[in-house]
Amino acid sequence: VGSEMCIRDSHYPRRPRRPQQPKEAATPIHIYPLGGLGEVGKNMTVYECCGDMIIVDCGLVFPDNDMFGVDMVIPDFTFVVQNKDKIRGLLITHGHEDHIGSIPYLLQKLDLPIYGTRLTCGLIRNKLEEFGLAGKTKFVEITPRQKLKLGCFTVEPIHVNHSIPDAVAFAIDSPAGTIIQTGDFKIDYTPLACGPTDLATLSEYGQKGVLALLSDSTNAERPGFTATEQKVADGVRSLFARAQNKRIIIATFASNIYRVQQIIDLAVEDGRKVAFSGRSMVNNTAMAQELGYMHIPEGTLISIDEINQYPPEQVVLVTTGSQGEPLSALSRMASCSHRQVRVGPGDFIIISAKPIPGNEKSVTKIVNGLLLLGAEVIYEGMYDVHVSGHACQEEQKLMLTLTRPKYFLPVHGEYKQLKKHAITAASLGIPTSNILIAENGSNIILSQDEMKLGEPVTAGAVMVDGLGVGDVGNVVLRDRKHLSEDGLVIIVATVDSKTGKVLAGPDLVSRGFVYVRENESLMDGAQSIVETALDRCVDEHVRDWNSVKTRVREALSSYIYRRTKRSPMILPILMEV
């Protein structure tokens, strides 16, 4: 889907609004979204004005089910590398993976200062230590309302509520005007900590004049308001009461410091010890305690190795694995491969998270495994064990009403969510000609006079597989998909380099296709087909080895399909002597 302007005819009355404060009207600002549009994750946006650039966020997205063997997907950094001399800094809205997960890969190409709140910098620093980059990177800790000067940009962080502490929006001022990028946000009037979203500052910018708003679209299809985190505390407290004589195991996001603190507080109320399982959970909670974002009373925290020394009713285990990750602690518990934890009928398990789209099957598999072991399992939809960290429609309307932008760009969502958010904006009187549903790689040019699209820039998905970054492309994925569906047949033969005659073999090896011992007639027939194809090449004086391999592959493929209605990958290996 290309970038879309004028989403539909608008019959809504235009609201009276204060005029934009005069700026240098001839000066445009360019916005280049490199990720986060048409997808949930991989958020990355570049702003350019007067020869200066800043980057907001640098996240990853986890692979689709058909991306076999791929660990994660990151943005294509070609454009920022080409413009590295213009970049004044990397600003981060908050510490979730879809906003910070690609930073190590970017820093392997560029040396950039990172601007983030205290907790956000702590989470990034932990991540960079795994790559040996933490000591080489300049961190600048920021606080809400503290303005930053980066080239021609003046940036003010604005406190917002989210499912992680220290989340901010950014008001980005330039000679072209002021742009507000919300990051992930919701409006929670009774948050657990840090206070409500700073509506006053957002309103101040709306009064001064906002050129454009880039706003979180994740929950654009959900009416009403997002529930408060206090609701989760009440729901989990009632479940603690139900599990009086059982060990409690709770899976949640390791980055959800609020949720983990809630669990600790409830455990203390119930007289239970707390243990953590999962590397990211252990690392994040240790870092949160060190920075003062988490408080665990003395004597409450125990090692995972100590949990079996206490009666089950005196233990709460907080673990990773709420998204069904195959190697997570909860997954290992479900498969009986966790070193310290054996799940059984005495366990009460709460999955305090909603599956990210695409993870539903993985989560269901873990739930089934835990139930088969005799545990009682509670998950999202059964009780109030999770609330979203993203704004629903009424909060999105409030953000639009407070900031009163001239132009609106919905971001952070799949196309259907961006579209719905655009319709919501139009319902508030923003002219549809001033609303743009863009795509990754768009070159959005804004000024006081107009919004237009320039020449697109390089943007896309770079796949990370182990230590390989970008070496897995569509051809490799197609081969992996082929292998996963019908398997592989390898043909090995030794041939005379001068005559082409077969000196040894051909031998056939099957992997993921058929079990050879139970299909000897099929494999004998396949061997005969290969011998015939090689003999014909000799008779017809075919000496080009690529042509010989193609003939062998086509002959064998046709035979196998006739016999099995399957099409395995066929790999001929001819050794010349």
Which sequence ranges carry the predicted segments?
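C-terminal tails and terminal domains of large nucleic-acid-associated
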Residues: 541-577
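Broad gene-expression machinery/nucleic-acid interaction feature
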Residues: 152, 167-169, 314, 486-490, ...
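A glycine- and charged-residue-rich anion-binding loop/surface
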Residues: 37, 61-71, 86-87, 379-382, ...
